[in-house]
Swiss-Prot record:
Motif placement: DDXXD motif: 378-382
Miscellaneous remark of the record: The conserved 64-Arg-Arg-65 motif may play a role in the isomerization step of the terpenoid cyclization reaction sequence.
Main location: plastid
Protein's name according to its UniProt entry: Myrcene synthase, chloroplastic
Name of the gene: ag2
């Protein structure tokens, strides 16, 4: 990566080292995990986290099922030793000066006397800089400037699209596709019918032969636009099909370059599996390698420098929050539950990849804690606990009294107390922003969640396979989307009285869609491993029960189609303007579905966290950007 001078700070040698190499030159931050097909605890298992039998403790004599999950892969000493100079005031001061300079670049699109700049490419200039600051993860500093720029573009928006400039005679695909995407994401009323201007009489998108770089970028922006589709938008489906095919063909012909890297990233992560911090990391690399993509050379340099500084400054905050989370985890006694998945580092990484504003610390930590708790609870209810123990635990948690632990098995006592104390802690945190005690509201969500888990535990115990609808309705609740999301959302600086909160929480359409999405997508990635552990019920098996003669492939095709439809409905729920839900809360709730979807791109990234998930942690949490 090229060096970028940020004098006077560039003299510091720390700027030229990655975080990993500067802290532990020879010791990796993670442990090497043996192949999951190894023999463990004296039992032979299959390569996909199969069922194994063990006792809860040497003296309880109870035979139990366990999911043979790999242990926490991250080295505690390494995490506690993390350190970076980017928390020092000098870096923040430099970033603040750069923010002022970038604002001047926004404002320079108007002349000093208020007249407009050249009409040659004034629309595309505005779209480019707005798109760039958003992809670089620094848009929060330029809210007013972004609004002014997009108001200007919208003023010249026509039914057949726009050209590069306000006086352009001919509309072009690049400006129109990028404009449509950006305006829609910011709540402007724009119709996808505008894309029909670039189709022929047969509905095929028209492109000039040769696949020039400019044309490829146009189709790339068409692809990005097509992913922000609402239900029933046929032209968006056609745009996605065309652009997907076109870009795949282009990748076979163009050389390896920053453009090909950008195409691969966009096609791999799209919209609904993309994460703001991961995109910032990738787009910094892309812009640095390909200055030809800069419409404004001065702006490009300033944006890159600011984005790198912001990435590394936030990294210093991530380290402190992760170190706090590690202490919470160790003090909770949860590490003693060796049968459970311990993924606190991974969950914090997800939280910090979507909540990239430094002031949302309570959200990041709350989400990481909630996700870790529901993962441990999932392992207790699905595999380790006996039906009698689970009934005891469910009854005790509903009474919400710490004295209830006296009636529980030893291994459940610490779990009960961590749930009890963490929910109460987040209730106090939420009271700071909401001005009221939300515990009773939150407890109802947890009670429904435990009831759904208890129902599934009975299915496993009785060998019962429900019909698809019964399984799906219960599975929405047991997906844990609601309990993982509710309290973190309440810590945001967004006023959410109960009547507004119910617009994104239960029983809202938004919550139903998000919970359904997580259940369906999770099952398509986990059903084989779950079946090997003795959990027969899944969306796949229940669909096949409802449809005798159908195959697993039939079931997967049906469920994948449901998932694609849900994503479009979630897009609509996020961007529709006729509700009174603060966008801050709605966007974070939406981004949680993106974060969880990201872990399911290739496999169950919760359970198998030593592959793609490890790469995400390294790139967005443990490695800083080089200058």
């Amino acid at each position: 990566m090229a060096l970028v001078s940020i004098s006077p700070l560039a003299s510091k040698s720390c700027l030229r080292k990655s975080l990993i190499s500067s802290i532990h030159e020879h010791k990796p931050p993670y442990r090497t995990i043996p192949n999951l097909g190894m023999r463990r605890r004296g039992k032979s298992v299959t390569p996909s986290m199969s069922i194994s039998l063990a006792t809860a403790a040497p003296d309880d004599g109870v035979q139990r099922r366990i999911g043979d999950y790999h242990s926490n892969i991250w080295d505690d000493d390494f995490i506690q030793s993390l350190s970076t100079p980017y928390g020092e005031p000098s870096y923040q001061e430099r970033a603040e000066r750069l923010i002022v300079e970038v604002k001047k670049i926004f404002n320079s699109m108007y002349l000093d006397d208020g007249r407009l700049m050249s009409s040659f490419n004034d629309l595309m200039q505005r779209l480019w800089i707005v798109d760039s600051v958003e992809r670089l993860g620094i848009a929060r500093h330029f809210k007013n400037e972004i609004t002014s720029a997009l108001d200007y573009v919208f003023r010249y928006w026509e039914e057949n699209g726009i050209g590069c400039g306000r006086d352009s005679i001919v509309t072009d695909l690049n400006s129109t596709a990028l404009g449509f995407r950006t305006l829609r994401l910011h709540g402007y009323t724009v119709s996808p019918e505008v894309l029909k201007a670039f189709q022929d009489q047969n509905g095929q998108f028209v492109c000039s032969p040769g696949q020039t770089e400019g044309e490829i970028r146009s189709v790339l922006n068409l692809y990005r636009a097509s992913l922000i589709a609402f239900p029933g938008e046929k032209v968006m489906e056609e745009a996605e099909i065309f652009s997907t095919r076109y870009l795949k063909e282009a990748l076979q012909k163009i050389p390896v370059s920053a453009l090909s890297q950008e195409i691969k990233f966009v096609m791999e992560y799209g919209w609904h599996t993309n994460l703001p911090r991961l995109e910032a990391r990738n787009y910094i690399d892309t812009l640095e390698k390909d200055t030809s993509a800069w419409l404004n050379k001065n702006a490009g340099k300033k944006l890159l420098e600011l984005a790198k500084l912001e990435f590394n400054i936030f990294n210093s905050l991530q380290q402190k929050e992760l170190q706090y989370l590690l202490r919470w985890w160790k003090e909770s006694d949860l590490p003693k539950l060796t049968f459970a998945r311990h993924r606190h580092v991974e969950f914090y990484t997800l939280a910090s990849c979507i909540a990239i504003d430094p002031k949302h610390s309570a959200f990041r930590l709350g989400f990481a804690k909630m996700c870790h708790l529901v993962t441990v609870l999932d392992d207790i209810y699905d595999t380790f606990g006996t039906i009698d123990e689970l009934e005891l635990f469910t009854s005790a948690i509903k009474r919400w009294n710490s004295s209830e632990i006296e009636h529980l098995p030893e291994y459940m006592k610490c779990v009960y107390m961590v749930v009890f104390e963490t929910v109460n802690e987040l209730t106090r945190e939420a009271e700071k922003t909401q001005g009221r005690n939300t515990l009773n509201y939150v407890r109802k969500a947890w009670e429904a969640y435990f009831d759904s888990y208890m129902e599934e535990a009975k299915w496993i115990s009785n060998g019962y396979l429900p019909m698809f609808e019964e399984y799906h309705e219960n599975g929405k609740v047991s997906s844990a989307y609601r309990v993982a999301t509710l309290q973190p959302i309440l810590t945001l600086n967004a006023w959410l009285p109960d009547y507004i909160l119910k617009g994104i929480d239960f029983p809202s359409r938004f919550n139903d869609l998000a919970s359904s999405f997580l259940r369906l997508r999770g099952d398509t990635r986990c059903y084989k491993a779950d079946r090997d552990r003795g959990e027969e019920a899944s969306c796949i098996s229940c669909y096949m029960k409802d449809n005798p003669g159908s195959t697993e492939e039939d079931a997967l095709n049906h469920i994948n189609a449901m998932v694609n439809d849900i994503i479009k409905e979630l897009n609509w729920e996020l961007l529709r303007s006729n509700d009174n839900i603060p966008m801050l809360a709605k966007k974070h709730a939406f981004d949680i579905t993106r974060a969880l979807h990201h872990l399911y791109i290739y496999r169950d990234g919760f359970s198998v966290a030593n592959k793609e998930t490890k790469k995400l942690v390294m790139e967005t949490l443990l490695e800083s950007m080089l200058f």
